[in-house]
Amino acid sequence: HPVHMISTAPCFYHKENRLKTFVNEDYYDDLKYVEDNYSVIIGNDVWIGSGAYIKSGIRIGDGAVIGAGAVVTKDVEPYAIVAGVPARLIRYRFSKEQIESLLHIKWWDKDDDWLKENGHYFSDANGFISRFRQLEDSSNRRK
């Protein structure tokens, strides 16, 4: 925002403002494209609670949970649960070994048929991982 101007309202610095404009030329260039180092990267299957704030440049790992109203100022690891102001680690959703397996499985890349066939395993992490290993082993034996 142009904090150096009398008003920060776009009608005073953009000639093509959607609502109304009082100027004939642009006096301030908005950031049209944000550089990658300012982008927030959100992994797969992430849950972000209502009103959470995520600082620019932050990476949220796969399977992470951000509590409602949290202020995230640091990267969040995969399958971490964070909450608070500033956000802090509450706990991990799964054990280190389970997290490694889930990141290897990448279930979010599976097609709908695979998800339908294996959806009932999603309620038990160990059963899910075991099922995937069985499928992987049988697939490797066929090769």
Q: Whereabouts are the PLM-identified features?
A:
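Conserved catalytic-core motifs of eukaryotic protein kinase domains, centered on the activation segment
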Residues: 92-93
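Glycine-centered loop/turn positions within well-structured domains
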Residues: 70, 74, 78-80, 88
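C-terminal amphipathic helix plus adjacent low-complexity
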Residues: 123-143
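Flexible, glycine/small-residue-enriched loop-and-beta-strand segment within the central core
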Residues: 1-58
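Leloir-type glycosyltransferase catalytic cores
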Residues: 106, 113-123
